Amino acid sequence: MENTLTCSKTFRYFTFGNPDDAKYILYVLHGYGQLAEYFIRKFHDLGNNYFIVAPEGMHRFYLKGSNGRVGASWMTKEARELDISDTQNWLNHLKKEIDSNYSFQKEIVLGFSQGGATAARWTTINSIPNQIYWANVFPTDIDPKSIISKENNVNKHFAIGTQDEYFNSEEQLSTLSFYANLGFKTHIFNDSHTIDNITLKEILTDITKK
């Protein structure tokens, strides 16, 4: 018989920038097998206007064998619903803590790969209006219409590389079409499964200019 026990757990997150001076807060959710400590470095050159917050998935593991490099993930197929719930609670708690201490002109969330699915689930239950999904499949357990907003100040973007090894050409086109039909601005760049700096800055410029 399977049993569960609810108890407290310490989660880890990394930040970059000065929240007292920044105009915008950018939550960045890493992909499968990445660590927040290194993922956040992809956003270091955005400038002083951004305070970057990189939460880390609750599961950490050795990427190969039983030693060496470590990565993290947001969930696996095992006890999936429990992990989703725990992650939602932890992200909500983190946002509440930051909101109680700082104020920003704009809040933005970016989810990369597996972190994109996590971001999609998270943004259905909170009020972050500016969303960037990057090289991810939309999670099948939530209604896509739940992220559609009629508010004028909402910005939603999706980006993917032409050489992304996790999407063949047909899958790229269908994924781009899926997000476009939801009202997302879509972006495609000439690279693999990665964050493209030029595309990122173009998206952020579009979000922050309004």
Give the role of each language-model region.
Residues 31-35, 114, 136-140:
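Short beta->alpha connector loops
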Residues 7-19, 23-102:
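Serine-hydrolase catalytic machinery in alpha/beta-hydrolase-like enzymes
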Residues 137-209:
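The feature captures the conserved acid-bearing segment of alpha/beta-hydrolase catalytic domains
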Residues 41-44, 124-125, 177, 181:
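Short, well-ordered alpha-helices that flank and scaffold nucleotide-derived cofactor binding pockets
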Residues 118-122, 142:
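Hydrolases whose catalytic domains are alpha/beta-hydrolase-1, hotdog thioesterase
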Residues 108, 130-132:
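Residue in the alpha/beta-hydrolase core beta-strand immediately N-terminal to the catalytic nucleophile
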Residues 55-58, 132-140:
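Active-site nucleophile loop of the alpha/beta-hydrolase fold
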Residues 110-115, 119:
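Gly/Ala-rich beta-loop-alpha elbow adjacent to hydrolase catalytic centers
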